[in-house]
Amino acid sequence: TVYFLARDGYNLYQIFKHQGFANVEYLYTSRRALTLACIQEMDEEEMDTLPPYSTGQTVGEVLDYLCIDRNRITHLEEAGFHSFDEVLETETDMEAFKKLYVLDREVFLERCRRERENALAYFHGTGLLDRDGICFDCGWQGSSQWLLERFKKAVGCRTKHPFVYFAIKDGEKSRTQLHGMHYETWLFDFYKNYGLQNNINQNVVMYELFFSAPHESVFYYGDGGTVIFEEGEGDPRRQELLEGIADYIREGHSFVEKYEVETTPEISVGPLNRLIHRPTEEEAVAIGNLQNV
């Protein structure tokens, strides 16, 4: 079975399903949905995976993101905060939040256990925990694979799921997360087609259009494994754009199959690079009118 991870795998899943492949599944998941489900102890290593990830949020906003009832937090002042409205403005403030994880450890671990149980129910329903398979993700840093393997370890799952990525960027985070992992990339990674990486990095938003979905990101798994999405109603323009991408690929598939067309990654991304760097006047206007999807 090939599992296409939300939201990056939405387009490819629709195309594979349209082509009649039976062994494909769309996996509703996200980094947020897996992060808490992985945690069994509140040690330094685990706390490093938890928010806050950047300054600017209030203490209360971080707790809301984690679905923690503020009324159950009893050590706010001991951690160095005066109110839930206090803004985390510095690295020191972010470190202070870790004290809250320690002081109110059981409150956080209870939420982690609940999210793990609900995630377990969802993944059992997909069959992923019961059989080997392959997962597709757009990639860049390998976070989903790293989290999925952590979750599988937490629930005692031994099935194997190597990943296939569009590309993996070279960086400390990706090298750390993918160390010892089994994966393949199509476009580039640490060792393959390295010269393409700089060009992609400068225009990553355009490429990510191909790996988006009309639904919101998964927030967490509710009781019984129900999928809870982040607030939002989707975007009709995004839906229209994704349908156009899918239709274009479907129409071209018969030609590619009939004439056994093969191409290299470098040649494949050439037209998009031309569109980005040397658009015609008409194309430039059309791109300029695109909303950020």
Language-model features: locations:
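Long, low-complexity, Lys/Arg-enriched
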Residues: 1-293
